[in-house]
Regions:
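Sequence/structural signature of beta-propeller domains
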Residues: 1-354
């Protein structure tokens, strides 16, 4: 294990209208032709930047509501916590979490204490969706570029009273069901998805929480189309469940993002509670081919720097296409003020990988 080696920094330049949200980036994915796709945990849109003279610019925003039907008005955030690309689809996942109101400096102690009693959830947070992505543009529906007999269609996991089919399936899970039914907020070690990666037909989602006696949890699912625009879960578990659970020892940390590297899984790990760090990068060899009911101990690869109430690493994506050597691009929530450039820019880091 080593400290991170900073190879480079790149400027991400957004339009002025996105100025405030450059400080709450929560998901990132670099696709071919050097498009950078990003999500914020405070919006219901997907952002695209283009590689331009060793930085990312030419910001274009895609409203998710233009591609799939949201269960609530788009003014209510999806809380996008993961983005990935596979098979001409861009995948996004919301946090699937409850949230607790936080104290505000302009309110009295008594009012802030009362705020800490209030927990809520929002229907848009339970979005797991895939949107066709062809030639750098999102589409609601289009013909598969390599097979004219296949139609690509924007779809989401079926919505239910419990949020969606995944939450319905997890409600009786012996490890996670209590957290789901008790409606424990994500930052209180409650159920909270942060990170998605897709390998062939398998979808992996990392849980920031709950962390169970020091063990983090990763979910694996497979989906199928049941009707236009709707996805359902397949039965994939040996026990007949619609999901698999994989337990990871990450030194007591939760999962903050996932990334496929060949057939290995890179895991960005950080605190499940409202803490600055530690933040660490792990590698799980052969992580896309995991058996159930096995405890895994991924290899600690390197530490990721973090700040004092700032610079919280939230998203990772492979970046070797940018500078020609194995590397990882990292974006931060609550970036340090030194990272903010003009009215729309924020600096991301490129770390050496391997």
């Amino acid at each position: 294990m080593q400290d991170s080696i900073l190879l480079n920094q790149v400027l991400l330049t957004f339009t002025n209208s996105f100025k405030e949200h450059r400080e709450d980036l929560s998901a990132v994915m670099l696709t071919d032709k050097k498009y950078l796709w990003l999500g914020s945990d405070e919006t219901s849109s997907i952002e695209r930047l283009c590689w331009d003279n060793h930085n990312f610019a030419q910001h274009k925003q895609f409203r998710v509501a233009e591609y799939i039907d949201l269960p609530a008005p788009e003014e209510e955030e999806i809380d996008i916590e993961g983005i990935d690309y596979s098979g001409y689809y861009l995948w996004i996942v919301g946090s699937h979490s409850w949230k607790r109101k936080k104290p505000k400096p302009d309110k009295s102690d008594s009012k802030n204490i009362k705020r800490l009693t209030k927990v809520e959830s929002e229907p848009n947070r339970y979005i797991l969706a895939r949107i066709p992505l062809v030639d750098g543009e999102l589409q609601k529906s289009c013909t598969h570029p390599q097979d004219s007999n296949v139609q690509l269609t924007a779809s989401k996991l079926e919505v239910t009273q419990q949020g969606n089919l995944l939450m319905e399936a997890l409600a009786d899970d012996p490890h996670l069901g209590f957290f789901v039914k008790a409606e424990i907020p994500g930052k209180d070690n409650g159920f909270d998805i942060e990170g998605i990666t897709v390998y062939q037909n398998r979808i992996f989602m990392g849980l920031r929480g709950p962390v169970l006696r020091g063990w983090a949890v990763m979910l694996e699912i497979e989906v199928e189309s049941s009707q236009t625009g709707v996805l359902r879960l397949k039965n994939i578990s040996e026990e007949g469940r619609q999901y698999k659970k994989h337990f990871m020892f990450l030194n007591g940390l939760g999962i903050r993002d996932l990334c496929v590297h060949g057939e290995d899984l890179l895991i960005l790990a950080g605190p499940t509670m409202d803490l600055d760090g530690p933040v660490q990068l792990y590698c799980l060899p052969g992580g896309v081919h995991l058996q159930e009911n096995v405890l895994h101990s991924p290899e600690l690869v390197q530490k990721i720097p973090y700040g004092n109430r700032e610079d919280h690493a939230e998203g990772i994506t492979l970046a070797q296409d940018l500078f020609g050597e194995p590397s990882l691009l990292v974006v931060y929530d609550s970036p340090a003020k030194a990272r903010l450039v003009d009215d729309g820019g924020v600096i991301a880091d490129i770390f050496k990988l391997g």
